Amino acid sequence: EMQRSLVGSEMCIRDSFYNERRKQLLEVEPNRGHELLAELEKDFQVTIVTQNIDNLHERAGSSHIIHLHGELTKVCSSRDPNNPHYIKELKPEEFEVKIGDLAGDGSQLRPFIVWFGESVPEIETAIDWVEKADVFVIIGTSMNVYPAAGLLNYVPRNAEIYLIDPKPVDVHSSRPIHVIQKGASEGVAELREKLLTTNHA
């Protein structure tokens, strides 16, 4: 009984944490960096691979996004988290998920988030797209979180690599990397100009 009670209280804490995060998401808007990445689709085929669990890229207008660590606005089965039949997109009025809210297989709903120690199922999809890239862009990441940091190993030899970050980032790679030492918004704007003036468009 004690063990069941502890598990239940742990789920309550987790649900409460993610419920609050969902509410906060309603108060946040995409920034200019998100919008500029979406605008790149006018001239290029763009795939965004993100470690963020928010939906700001979608709201900014990007159409092809791979969420490595899951999505805050979705819930899934606690028994079979990656089964697409039980993954549900929540409307804002459904953001409050409680103990007793069940997935289609009868198990407790849980956030569609990759928790510590769980596998990252979308990494294979990300690798497939990285292997086709003509241009690979790293924005605002320390390159220390795996498996995402390992994507650099799958960039084709003839692809250009850009790093956008206002702070110095130690990237462990023998590949030449074009560094744009600016924030995301200014950096993506500069990147777009560079790409449009070369033969990528």
Put a short name on every predicted segment.
Residues E1-G8, I13:
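Single conserved hydrophobic/aromatic residue that forms the stacking wall/gate
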Residues V7-G8, A60-S63, R157, S173-P176:
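Short, structured coil segments at secondary-structure junctions
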Residues E10, R14-V75, A103:
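Ligand-binding beta-strand-loop-alpha-helix segment within the catalytic cores
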Residues K23-E29, F112-S119, I138-T141:
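Short, flexible loop segments at the rims of nucleotide/cofactor-binding pockets, characterized by
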Residues R32-E35, P121, Y146-P147:
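Short, conserved clusters of charged catalytic residues that mark active-site
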Residues I48, I65-H67, W115, I161-L163, ...:
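Conserved beta-strand scaffold positions in the cores of enzyme catalytic domains, especially
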Residues L56-E124, D128:
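Cys/His-rich short segments
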Residues T125-A201:
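SIR2/sirtuin-family catalytic core signature
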